[in-house]
Curated annotation (Swiss-Prot):
This is Ig kappa chain V region K16-167. Residues 100-109 are annotated as: Framework-4. One of its GO terms (biological process) is adaptive immune response. Keywords: Adaptive immunity, Immunity, Immunoglobulin. Residues 58-89 are annotated as: Framework-3. Residues 24-35 are annotated as: Complementarity-determining-1. It holds the Pfam family V-set. This chain was obtained from antibody to the polysaccharide of a streptococcal group a variant and was isolated from the serum of a single rabbit. Residues 51-57 are annotated as: Complementarity-determining-2. SMART domains: IG (SM00409), IGv (SM00406).
Length: 109
């Protein structure tokens, strides 16, 4: 079964700095179908990145996805207070099963 393991929480980030969240898949993600989501308390997840590196509509270019196969990263540059949230990667295996990562909380200081 596909397992997505992320950078352990919490991760501390300074305003204006850069933070990178990693996501490791236990097997190759099918066709690079890897997405990143941002979730804040009481809100539904917001899609940031799909197909590993494609920015979703309306998402600032400070968010950049990269990687392929089993290793993926989400660097956030120019960190803002509003970036404080929990971030999830989501992968798809060859059976089209969708699997979420463990989640990484980003704390902005």
């Amino acid at each position: 079964a596909l397992v997505m393991t992320q950078t352990p929480s919490p991760v501390s980030a300074a305003v204006g700095g850069t933070v990178t969240i990693s996501c490791q898949a236990s097997q190759s993600v099918y066709s690079n179908n890897l997405s990143w989501f941002q979730q804040k308390p009481g809100q539904p997840p917001k899609l940031l990145i799909y197909k590993a590196s494609t920015l979703a509509s309306g998402v600032p270019s400070r968010f950049k996805g990269s990687g392929s196969g089993t290793q993926f990263t989400l660097p956030i540059s120019g960190v803002e207070c509003d970036d404080a949230a929990t971030y999830y990667c989501q992968g798809t295996n060859t059976g089209n099963n969708i699997v979420f990562g463990t989640g990484t909380e980003v704390v902005v200081k």
